[in-house]
Amino acid sequence: MVACVVKDWQGADSGEATLDLATAKPETASHIVHRALVRQLANARQGTVSTKTRAEVRGGGRKPWRQKGTGRARAGSIRSPLWRGGGVIFGPKPRDYSQKMNRKERRLALRTALMSRVEDLIVVQDFADHLPRPKTKELVTALQRWGIEPEQKVLLLAADITETVALSARNVPTLKLLRADQLNVFDLLYADRIVATTGAIAKIQEVYGD
Protein backbone atom coordinates (compact mmCIF):
# COMPACT_ATOMS: atom_id res chain seq x y z
CA MET A 1 0.00 0.00 0.00
CA VAL A 2 1.21 3.47 -0.92
CA ALA A 3 0.03 6.67 0.77
CA CYS A 4 0.10 9.85 -1.31
CA VAL A 5 -0.36 13.45 -0.20
CA VAL A 6 -3.34 15.11 -1.87
CA LYS A 7 -2.92 18.67 -3.13
CA ASP A 8 -5.72 21.15 -3.69
CA TRP A 9 -6.15 23.51 -6.66
CA GLN A 10 -3.73 26.01 -5.10
CA GLY A 11 -1.04 23.37 -4.48
CA ALA A 12 -1.45 23.12 -0.70
CA ASP A 13 -1.62 19.76 1.09
CA SER A 14 -5.23 18.85 1.83
CA GLY A 15 -5.27 15.19 2.81
CA GLU A 16 -4.03 11.73 1.93
CA ALA A 17 -4.96 9.05 -0.60
CA THR A 18 -3.91 5.40 -0.64
CA LEU A 19 -3.27 3.06 -3.54
CA ASP A 20 -3.04 -0.67 -2.92
CA LEU A 21 -2.38 -2.75 -6.06
CA ALA A 22 -0.83 -6.19 -6.36
CA THR A 23 2.33 -6.16 -8.49
CA ALA A 24 4.57 -8.75 -10.11
CA LYS A 25 7.48 -10.30 -8.24
CA PRO A 26 10.69 -8.25 -8.47
CA GLU A 27 12.47 -10.92 -10.53
CA THR A 28 9.72 -10.98 -13.20
CA ALA A 29 8.41 -7.40 -13.04
CA SER A 30 10.56 -5.87 -15.78
CA HIS A 31 9.95 -8.84 -18.09
CA ILE A 32 6.16 -8.74 -17.88
CA VAL A 33 6.04 -4.95 -18.26
CA HIS A 34 8.33 -5.20 -21.29
CA ARG A 35 6.09 -7.83 -22.86
CA ALA A 36 3.02 -5.67 -22.32
CA LEU A 37 4.76 -2.63 -23.82
CA VAL A 38 5.96 -4.54 -26.90
CA ARG A 39 2.46 -5.96 -27.36
CA GLN A 40 0.84 -2.52 -27.17
CA LEU A 41 3.24 -1.01 -29.71
CA ALA A 42 2.94 -4.02 -32.02
CA ASN A 43 -0.86 -3.93 -31.90
CA ALA A 44 -0.80 -0.25 -32.87
CA ARG A 45 0.92 -1.05 -36.18
CA GLN A 46 -1.31 -0.92 -39.26
CA GLY A 47 0.66 -3.57 -41.13
CA THR A 48 -0.43 -2.20 -44.52
CA VAL A 49 3.02 -1.61 -46.06
CA SER A 50 3.42 -3.47 -49.35
CA THR A 51 6.06 -3.84 -52.06
CA LYS A 52 5.88 -5.56 -55.46
CA THR A 53 7.88 -8.64 -56.33
CA ARG A 54 9.23 -9.23 -59.85
CA ALA A 55 6.02 -11.13 -60.62
CA GLU A 56 3.83 -8.13 -59.69
CA VAL A 57 5.72 -5.28 -61.39
CA ARG A 58 4.13 -4.24 -64.67
CA GLY A 59 6.04 -5.38 -67.76
CA GLY A 60 9.07 -7.61 -68.08
CA GLY A 61 7.39 -10.50 -69.83
CA ARG A 62 9.71 -10.49 -72.86
CA LYS A 63 13.36 -11.46 -72.72
CA PRO A 64 15.34 -8.21 -73.30
CA TRP A 65 17.88 -9.80 -75.65
CA ARG A 66 18.88 -13.23 -76.77
CA GLN A 67 20.72 -15.51 -74.40
CA LYS A 68 24.03 -15.69 -76.28
CA GLY A 69 26.02 -13.76 -78.82
CA THR A 70 25.61 -10.16 -77.67
CA GLY A 71 28.57 -10.03 -75.28
CA ARG A 72 26.29 -8.73 -72.55
CA ALA A 73 25.30 -10.51 -69.36
CA ARG A 74 22.33 -12.78 -69.80
CA ALA A 75 18.97 -11.31 -68.80
CA GLY A 76 15.52 -12.85 -68.73
CA SER A 77 13.40 -9.87 -67.70
CA ILE A 78 13.66 -6.10 -67.37
CA ARG A 79 11.88 -6.45 -64.00
CA SER A 80 14.63 -8.48 -62.37
CA PRO A 81 15.43 -7.22 -58.84
CA LEU A 82 18.90 -6.35 -60.17
CA TRP A 83 17.45 -3.79 -62.58
CA ARG A 84 16.22 -0.28 -61.93
CA GLY A 85 12.44 -0.47 -61.81
CA GLY A 86 12.56 -4.16 -61.01
CA GLY A 87 10.81 -6.05 -58.26
CA VAL A 88 11.82 -6.06 -54.60
CA ILE A 89 13.43 -9.11 -53.02
CA PHE A 90 11.84 -10.15 -49.71
CA GLY A 91 10.14 -6.76 -49.31
CA PRO A 92 7.41 -6.18 -46.71
CA LYS A 93 3.88 -7.38 -47.38
CA PRO A 94 0.65 -6.65 -45.48
CA ARG A 95 0.61 -8.68 -42.28
CA ASP A 96 -0.89 -8.77 -38.81
CA TYR A 97 1.63 -7.68 -36.16
CA SER A 98 -0.71 -8.14 -33.20
CA GLN A 99 0.48 -10.18 -30.24
CA LYS A 100 -1.54 -12.09 -27.68
CA MET A 101 -1.17 -11.66 -23.96
CA ASN A 102 -3.41 -13.12 -21.29
CA ARG A 103 -5.78 -10.69 -19.59
CA LYS A 104 -4.40 -11.43 -16.12
CA GLU A 105 -0.87 -10.79 -17.37
CA ARG A 106 -1.90 -7.51 -19.01
CA ARG A 107 -3.56 -6.27 -15.83
CA LEU A 108 -0.61 -7.38 -13.72
CA ALA A 109 1.79 -5.54 -16.03
CA LEU A 110 -0.37 -2.41 -15.84
CA ARG A 111 -0.49 -2.46 -12.04
CA THR A 112 3.26 -3.11 -11.86
CA ALA A 113 4.00 -0.21 -14.22
CA LEU A 114 1.78 2.16 -12.24
CA MET A 115 3.20 1.20 -8.85
CA SER A 116 6.74 1.60 -10.21
CA ARG A 117 5.94 5.27 -10.91
CA VAL A 118 4.59 6.24 -7.46
CA GLU A 119 7.63 8.48 -6.89
CA ASP A 120 6.47 10.57 -9.87
CA LEU A 121 2.78 10.47 -8.94
CA ILE A 122 1.00 13.64 -7.82
CA VAL A 123 -2.52 13.27 -6.41
CA VAL A 124 -4.80 16.31 -6.57
CA GLN A 125 -8.38 17.07 -5.66
CA ASP A 126 -10.94 16.93 -8.46
CA PHE A 127 -10.61 20.31 -10.13
CA ALA A 128 -13.32 20.34 -12.80
CA ASP A 129 -15.28 22.93 -10.79
CA HIS A 130 -12.28 25.30 -10.97
CA LEU A 131 -12.55 25.35 -14.77
CA PRO A 132 -16.09 26.60 -15.49
CA ARG A 133 -14.94 27.48 -19.00
CA PRO A 134 -12.04 26.22 -21.14
CA LYS A 135 -8.85 27.99 -20.05
CA THR A 136 -5.51 26.45 -20.94
CA LYS A 137 -3.51 29.05 -19.04
CA GLU A 138 -5.25 28.25 -15.74
CA LEU A 139 -4.59 24.52 -16.14
CA VAL A 140 -0.91 25.09 -17.00
CA THR A 141 -0.55 27.39 -13.98
CA ALA A 142 -2.13 24.76 -11.76
CA LEU A 143 0.34 22.15 -13.02
CA GLN A 144 3.18 24.46 -12.05
CA ARG A 145 1.68 24.94 -8.57
CA TRP A 146 1.65 21.18 -8.21
CA GLY A 147 5.41 21.10 -8.81
CA ILE A 148 5.62 20.24 -12.50
CA GLU A 149 8.24 21.87 -14.73
CA PRO A 150 7.04 23.31 -18.08
CA GLU A 151 9.18 20.94 -20.19
CA GLN A 152 8.10 17.76 -18.37
CA LYS A 153 5.78 15.30 -20.08
CA VAL A 154 2.65 14.89 -17.97
CA LEU A 155 -0.01 12.19 -17.88
CA LEU A 156 -3.21 13.57 -16.35
CA LEU A 157 -5.67 10.97 -15.05
CA ALA A 158 -9.27 11.74 -14.17
CA ALA A 159 -12.26 9.57 -13.29
CA ASP A 160 -14.44 11.50 -15.75
CA ILE A 161 -13.27 14.06 -18.28
CA THR A 162 -15.52 17.08 -18.64
CA GLU A 163 -15.61 19.06 -21.85
CA THR A 164 -14.00 22.12 -20.26
CA VAL A 165 -11.08 20.06 -18.91
CA ALA A 166 -10.61 18.34 -22.27
CA LEU A 167 -10.62 21.66 -24.14
CA SER A 168 -8.25 23.23 -21.60
CA ALA A 169 -5.76 20.37 -21.91
CA ARG A 170 -5.79 19.61 -25.63
CA ASN A 171 -3.52 22.50 -26.66
CA VAL A 172 -0.70 21.60 -24.23
CA PRO A 173 1.81 19.54 -26.26
CA THR A 174 3.44 17.94 -23.20
CA LEU A 175 0.13 16.92 -21.57
CA LYS A 176 -1.78 13.68 -22.17
CA LEU A 177 -5.28 13.44 -20.70
CA LEU A 178 -6.72 9.99 -19.96
CA ARG A 179 -9.66 8.50 -18.11
CA ALA A 180 -8.60 6.32 -15.18
CA ASP A 181 -10.18 3.21 -16.72
CA GLN A 182 -8.18 3.68 -19.95
CA LEU A 183 -4.71 3.25 -18.47
CA ASN A 184 -2.03 1.74 -20.65
CA VAL A 185 1.58 0.75 -20.08
CA PHE A 186 3.10 3.04 -22.73
CA ASP A 187 1.60 6.28 -21.38
CA LEU A 188 2.49 5.33 -17.80
CA LEU A 189 6.14 4.77 -18.72
CA TYR A 190 6.47 7.63 -21.23
CA ALA A 191 5.38 10.44 -18.90
CA ASP A 192 7.86 12.25 -16.67
CA ARG A 193 5.17 12.99 -14.07
CA ILE A 194 1.73 11.50 -13.48
CA VAL A 195 -1.07 13.65 -12.07
CA ALA A 196 -4.17 11.81 -10.84
CA THR A 197 -7.29 13.21 -9.24
CA THR A 198 -8.67 11.60 -6.09
CA GLY A 199 -11.55 10.32 -8.19
CA ALA A 200 -9.06 8.72 -10.58
CA ILE A 201 -7.25 7.00 -7.71
CA ALA A 202 -10.56 5.58 -6.46
CA LYS A 203 -11.45 4.45 -9.98
CA ILE A 204 -8.05 2.79 -10.48
CA GLN A 205 -8.45 0.96 -7.17
CA GLU A 206 -11.94 -0.15 -8.21
CA VAL A 207 -11.05 -1.30 -11.73
CA TYR A 208 -7.56 -2.73 -11.25
CA GLY A 209 -7.50 -3.70 -7.57
CA ASP A 210 -7.90 -7.46 -7.94
From Swiss-Prot:
SUPFAM superfamilies: Ribosomal protein L4. Residues 60-71 have a biased composition (Basic residues). The keyword Iron does not apply. Transmembrane segments: none annotated. One of its GO terms (biological process) is translation. InterPro entries: Ribosomal_uL4, Ribosomal_uL4-like, Ribosomal_uL4_dom_sf. It comes from the Bacteria. Residues 56-77 are annotated as: Disordered. The keyword DNA damage does not apply. GO terms for molecular function: rRNA binding; structural constituent of ribosome. One of its GO terms (cellular component) is ribonucleoprotein complex. Keywords: Ribonucleoprotein, Ribosomal protein, RNA-binding, rRNA-binding. One of the primary rRNA binding proteins, this protein initially binds near the 5'-end of the 23S rRNA. It is important during the early stages of 50S assembly. It makes multiple contacts with different domains of the 23S rRNA in the assembled 50S subunit and ribosome. Forms part of the polypeptide exit tunnel. Part of the 50S ribosomal subunit. Belongs to the universal ribosomal protein uL4 family. This is Large ribosomal subunit protein uL4. It comes from Thermosynechococcus vestitus (strain NIES-2133 / IAM M-273 / BP-1). The gene is rplD.
